[in-house]
Amino acid sequence: MKQKADNLIAQNKKASHDYFIKETLEAGIALTGTEIKSIRARRINLRDGYVQIINGSAFLENVHISEYKEGNRYNHDPLRSRRLLLHKREIARLAGIQAQQGMAIIPLKVYLKHGFAKVLIGVGQGKKQYDKRQTIKKRDQDREIHRKYGI
């Protein structure tokens, strides 16, 4: 029986528009019970999220996971900081990148892998407004060539 590829839950489409993605890295997320249930129900928003390194630990900040519908008084806070599960050397490398000017560490995708929630984080450099215009112009030219010549 063929298994689905990575069970994509959420994708940050705005990230590729706002950043040049230099490299990617897979990390686990430390979640509570109601959070994983909400993620499985696809009630997560990555748009404004980022990764912050604090005291040798990586945290996923400003990612909204909606409260679980059937949750009771023990439901989670939707915008709480969530610890990322990474090796020390990966955290040290990300801390060096975070210290550089103009570099950001952002979540790109959340997916399930063997039943566990994983986040694909990307190291990105912010785009300027003219870079965004050039990207749109190039995409339109490629579409026109494809439409005209069927390449």
Curated annotation (Swiss-Prot):
Predominant cellular place of this UniProt entry's protein: cytoplasm
This protein's record includes keyword Cytoplasm: yes
Gene Ontology molecular function terms on file: RNA binding
This protein's UniProt keywords: Cytoplasm, RNA-binding
Compartments in which it is found: Cytoplasm
Location of region: Disordered: 132-151
GO biological process, one term: trans-translation
One Pfam family cited in the UniProt record for this chain: SmpB
Highest rank taxon of the organism: Bacteria
A single GO cellular-component term on record: cytosol
UniProt keyword Iron-sulfur, yes or no: no
Family recorded in the similarity comment: Belongs to the SmpB family.
Function summary: Required for rescue of stalled ribosomes mediated by trans-translation. Binds to transfer-messenger RNA (tmRNA), required for stable association of tmRNA with ribosomes. tmRNA and SmpB together mimic tRNA shape, replacing the anticodon stem-loop with SmpB. tmRNA is encoded by the ssrA gene; the 2 termini fold to resemble tRNA(Ala) and it encodes a 'tag peptide', a short internal open reading frame. During trans-translation Ala-aminoacylated tmRNA acts like a tRNA, entering the A-site of stalled ribosomes, displacing the stalled mRNA.
Name used for this protein in its record: SsrA-binding protein
Protein's organism: Lactobacillus johnsonii (strain CNCM I-12250 / La1 / NCC 533)
Gene: smpB
